[in-house]
A protein has these predicted regions:
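Conserved N-proximal alpha/beta basic substrate-recognition cap immediately N-terminal to
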Residues: 20-136, 284
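Beta-strand scaffold of nucleotide-dependent catalytic cores
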Residues: 193, 199-206, 212-220, 228-230, ...
Length: 357
C-alpha cells in the first residue's frame, strides 16, 4: 500500500511541475520580447544582454530591472536581496490554497465571506430591478465594477447628480455583468490627499492557523482627478511603518518619481500618521482568520466617515514584493523568507531555487 500511495503522490505532482515549466517559458518568451523592444526604442540604462542575465537568475520583468528595483546598477550580491514578482508567484502557487484563491478572485464570494467587515450596500446589477436601481442611484453615488475586472479597469462612478438615461444604463450594467457598490465616504484625513479617489491602505498578512503577521503596508493615493488609486491608473503609494502607522518615506509612482507631498493637493505625505492604525491591524488579522487557510493576503481597506475600518477588496497574491521594495530600493527577500519560515514552517526560497537557470 505504501508503494501505491507514493506513486499517487508522484502522479499528483507531475502536472504541477509541468505547469511551472510552461509558466517559466511563457514568461521567458514574453519578458525577453518586451525587453528587446524597450531596449531598441528607448533611451535606457543597462543593456539587453545584462537584462537577459538578470531574467535567467531572478525572473525580473523589464519594469523591475529598469524602474522598480533598478537592477541595471546593482551587483549580483545586491540583486540577490530582491525578490521578483514572478518568484513570488511561484511561492503563491506552491503554498497558497486553491479554495482561498477562488474566494478572493470572485468579488461576490469575497463580499459574502467577509461581510462582517463590509459596511456598504452592494449588489450585482442583475439581482435588482430597474426601479430599485433608480431609487439607489438617486439616493447615493455608486461605483460600478466589472465582475471579472482587475487593476481598476472598467470601473466608473455613477453620480446621482448626473443627467442620464437611467434605464439604458441599468440594462447596460445588467448585460455587462457589473457589480454595484455604494461609494464610501472617506474620513477627511485621508480624503484630503486626493478627493476624487478613495485613498486606500494595503495591508499584507502572512498567516497559518492563529498565527498572523503583518508583513508590510502601503498608503495608496489617486492623482489627476482619477477615481482609481492604484499605480496602473497613475496613482502613487508610500510605505507605512507597520509598528507605528507612520509614513517614513516619500511616495513613489510607477516611473520612479518620488513625492514628499501630493503632486495635486500639496498635502504632506512623508511623516503622516495613518488614523486608527491599530484598529486597521486588528481588523486585517481578524479577517485573515475568517475562513481557513488564508496564508497570504493583501487587504485593501479604508477609514469611512463613521470611523469604521472597511475592507474594500482582497488579493490572495499581493504584490508586496514590489510595494515594499520599490520605494526604499531595498530588497526584502530574506525578510519574506524568515517570516514564512516563522509563520508556516516552510522555506519559500527552496521552492524557487529550481528556476535559477
Amino acid at each position: 500500500m505504501g508503494v501505491v500511495y507514493k506513486e499517487k503522490n508522484i502522479m499528483r505532482l507531475i502536472p504541477m511541475f509541468l505547469r511551472e515549466i510552461c509558466v517559466y517559458f511563457n514568461e521567458k518568451k514574453q519578458f525577453l520580447r518586451d525587453a528587446h523592444n524597450k531596449f531598441s526604442h528607448e533611451i535606457v540604462h543597462g543593456s539587453y544582454k545584462d537584462y537577459v542575465d538578470a531574467f535567467k537568475k531572478h525572473r525580473v520583468t523589464y519594469s523591475e530591472y529598469m524602474y522598480s528595483y533598478e537592477y541595471w546598477h546593482l551587483n549580483e550580491e545586491e540583486r540577490d536581496e530582491f525578490i521578483s514578482t514572478s518568484e513570488m508567484q511561484v511561492i503563491y502557487r506552491k503554498l497558497g490554497n486553491k479554495k482561498v484563491r477562488e474566494i478572493f478572485h470572485d468579488k461576490v464570494q469575497f463580499l459574502n465571506a467577509f461581510s462582517p467587515f463590509i459596511h456598504r450596500w452592494w449588489s450585482l446589477a442583475k439581482n435588482i430591478s430597474y426601479e430599485e436601481f433608480k431609487r439607489i442611484v438617486l439616493q447615493f453615488d455608486v461605483i460600478a465594477k466589472p465582475i471579472d475586472g482587475t487593476r481598476g479597469k472598467g470601473i466608473f462612478k455613477i453620480s446621482s447628480s448626473e443627467d442620464k438615461d437611467w434605464k439604458e444604463l441599468y440594462y447596460q450594467l445588467v448585460g455587462d455583468d457589473y457589480l454595484l457598490e455604494q461609494c464610501i465616504l472617506e474620513t477627511d484625513e485621508l480624503k484630503e490627499f486626493h478627493p476624487a479617489s478613495l485613498n486606500t491602505i494595503r495591508v499584507v498578512t502572512i498567516s497559518c492557523g492563529d498565527h498572523c503577521e503583518v508583513f508590510g503596508a502601503l498608503f495608496r493615493m489617486g492623482t489627476h482627478g482619477s477615481i482609481i488609486d492604484n499605480t496602473h491608473a497613475g496613482g502613487i503609494f508610500a510605505p507605512i511603518n507597520v509598528e507605528t502607522g507612520i509614513i517614513d518615506f516619500p511616495a513613489i509612482d510607477g516611473r520612479n518619481n518620488y513625492y514628499s507631498v501630493h503632486p495635486d493637493t500639496g498635502k504632506q505625505i512623508k511623516g503622516f500618521c495613518i488614523p486608527k492604525w491599530e484598529k486597521i491591524v486588528v481588523t486585517c488579522k481578524e479577517a485573515s482568520r475568517t475562513i481557513p487557510n488564508i496564508y497570504f493576503a493583501g487587504w485593501d481597506v479604508c477609514i469611512n466617515s463613521n470611523g469604521q475600518v472597511e475592507i474594500i477588496e482582497g488579493n490572495h497574491a499581493p504584490d508586496f514584493d514590489g510595494g515594499m521594495q520599490a520605494p526604499l530600493k531595498k530588497g526584502v527577500k530574506r525578510k519574506i523568507q524568515q517570516t514564512i519560515i516563522d509563520v508556516m514552517g516552510k522555506d519559500p526560497l527552496k521552492l524557487i531555487s529550481i528556476w535559477k537557470y
